[in-house]
A protein has these predicted regions:
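A short, acidic, amphipathic alpha-helical segment used as a generic capping/interface helix at domain edges
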Residues: 283-291, 313-337
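Alpha/beta catalytic barrel-like cores
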Residues: 27, 33-183, 297, 325-333, ...
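Aromatic- and acid-rich polysaccharide-binding/catalytic face
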Residues: 263-289, 293-309
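Short, well-ordered coil/turn segments that N-cap beta-strands
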Residues: 86-88, 157-162, 210-214, 249-253, ...
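Active-site-proximal beta-alpha loop/turn segments in soluble metabolic enzymes
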Residues: 172-186, 217-233, 302-311, 345-354
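Active-site loop segments of alpha/beta catalytic cores
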Residues: 164, 179, 185-283
Length: 385
């Protein structure tokens, strides 16, 4: 079987996007390996999974969280997730409870050469760089995720779908370089540990909750550096690294682009769901969003602001989102897909808010998602009339 060179420096968006993911996943599911030129890593052989509930995972009217919540009590955080985003609950991350549960520390702890201190800082033992990552959940680093999984275990009925998230290789690579690793080693190890966590979490959910679909997001706040020309590695290398992380997953995947991050790079890596802030800056990427929707992709609209007061009503965020949709439609996006192929989330994590504020932001997102679901039902009735 011949594959187009998806790692070629001149590969365009049509190759580097959804086509890339189809190729990568077909390679993996065939039980073969392919070495990626930019970082010299091999996508490992993984077992072929039987068809599950994932094909019907995404439906109009879903809301979820980005990840972080302000709570110190993991059970309380999980209760908020289950109550405010019941159709797509998310595993909370609790950095205020412990710096070890910060978005860098909780994932790099799987690297044998990394020591995470109580304050979340990293130190490197370079003699252990050649050792494989060993992902394992522990109460110090993953209290929110462990409490979430326990709540699902004891629930009388599991949700149809859940969302988990892992910090991506670009963001982890920058952190590892700052901790003292050479750039090439830092990003190579970041890719290895991100892929290891993706496989570990998916296998865990599949084994424990086989009837529950998984949406697995890769969080990449560092994408803002590529948007503003401050990239630590080349664009094509970054696409290779992020695409390789997505490719080891058999579940539905997403990439969260925080704030003014590079949505074009995220799209080029080929996620099923593209998470962006629902602001006027999204109009600069209208062509990318159009291609993503045309390829049957979904968008997670970060429509509830996290950098200013939300207000008591859904009306303000809803009007802003509808206005954005209208302008995107004028710029070529399909008017039905732009409304119905979307989730609603807060713009970013909620760890910096009070507990009541965080719950309120999730509640606003849920009410907005309900409106999208109602519109989708109305559209189907109109078509069938």
């Amino acid at each position: 079987m011949e594959y187009p060179d998806i790692c070629a420096p001149n590969a365009g968006p049509d190759v580097m996007g959804s086509v890339a993911q189809r190729i990568l996943r077909s390679v993996i599911r065939a039980g073969t390996s392919r070495r990626f030129r930019s970082f010299g890593y091999v996508v490992p052989r993984v077992p072929v999974m039987s068809p599950g509930p994932h094909s019907a995972l995404l439906v109009p009217g879903l809301s979820t969280g980005i990840g972080s919540l302000p709570h110190l009590d993991p059970e309380a955080a999980v209760s908020v997730s289950l109550a405010e985003t019941p159709r797509l609950p998310f595993a909370p991350q609790l950095p205020n409870r412990s710096p070890r549960e910060g978005m860098i520390a909780e994932w790099v702890v799987a690297l044998p050469e990394v020591e995470v201190a109580d304050d979340g800082s990293l130190s490197i033992d370079s003699s252990r760089i050649g050792e494989a990552p060993t992902p394992s959940l522990n109460p110090d680093s993953h209290s929110g995720l462990l409490a979430f999984l326990e709540a699902l275990r004891v629930a009388p009925e599991n949700p149809k779908r859940i969302k988990l998230q892992v910090t991506g290789p670009l963001t982890l690579g920058i952190a590892l370089e700052a901790a003292g690793l050479p750039s090439d080693v830092a990003f190579r190890r970041a890719g290895e540990v991100s892929r290891a966590w993706v496989q570990h979490l998916e296998a865990l959910v599949t084994a424990r909750f086989p009837a529950t679909g998984l949406l697995l997001f890769i969080d990449e706040p560092a994408l803002v550096r590529w948007r503003h020309g401050d990239e630590p590695i080349g664009r094509d290398e970054a696409i290779d690294l992020l695409s390789g992380t997505l490719a080891v997953a058999n579940c539905i995947t997403g990439v969260h682009v925080c704030g003014d991050g590079d949505a074009r790079l995220a799209h080029a890596a080929g996620p099923d769901v593209l998470g962006i802030t629902a602001s006027d800056s999204a109009l600069e990427d209208a062509d990318v969003l159009m291609r993503h929707l045309e390829a049957d992709g979904w968008i997670a609209w970060g429509a509830v602001p996290t950098d200013r007061p939300v207000g008591d009503s859904t009306e303000g965020p809803w009007r802003r989102l509808v206005g954005l949709w209208c302008e995107l439609t004028r710029r070529g996006c399909d008017p039905v897909r732009v409304r119905t192929h979307g989730l609603v989330t807060p713009a970013c994590g909620l760890a910096g808010h009070g507990e009541a504020q965080a719950a309120h932001a999730l509640h606003i997102a849920s009410e907005m998602a309900d409106r999208i679901g109602d519109q989708a039902v109305a559209a189907r009735l109109t078509v069938g009339a």
